[in-house]
Amino acid sequence: QNEFMSAIVAGKTLDSFIKPEYLFQILTCIEATIPFVRPSADGLSASDRLYQRLQETNSKFNLNLTEAELIETVNKSVRMANRDISGFAAPSEIFIENTWNLLPETNHALLALNSYTVYDYRVAIEKTERFLSSLNPEFIFRKFDGKPDEKTYRNLVERARHNLEVGTLYLGCKLFSIAFMEALSLRVGLNIPLSTMMGEANCHDF
């Protein structure tokens, strides 16, 4: 939804200022930031399918982009997409920190600092651990037309694989400890704030 809305806003905002073929390229880059797209049943990657759609759209709307321009557009979109998710290949401590900092963004109950419950906290960690466990490192980063080169691409994949393993283990340990804390909190009552059990936290202590 975020990428779709970004494309709509970009299209409406820039439509009067730039040529259709340039807007076409911008929207292509925005679409490429949709993450974790798996290959199709016939083995085509997300970038391969995007390239096919660009060819069809270019022909349908007479945008007159050359084959070389279409390929370069997809290559630009790949670079943008890979930068957008570069954190998956970051050093493990940075990956863990980034994952931790995103918890409130995807679990709005945690925005109510010092009032979210032990249950809220446990659910947030459980959802994130389940999400990381579901990711296939082979489908995180993109490539097209030999770019990035195979060595660079495999390095990104293996670093992502390592980070997913570390992140899943870390969150699994957190989940075990908070499940124990949740069991204790139920002896006190339902919907007990985490701060009641552990003390008040600052915004970086999720």
Tell me the role of every PLM-derived stretch.
Residues 2-16:
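An active-site-proximal "capping" alpha-helix that borders the catalytic cofactor pocket
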Residues 1, 6, 27-36:
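His-Asp-centered metal-binding catalytic motifs of divalent-metal-dependent phosphohydrolases/nucleases
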Residues 12-21, 31-206:
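Divalent metal-dependent phosphate-bond-processing catalytic cores, especially two-metal-ion Mg2+/Mn2+ enzymes
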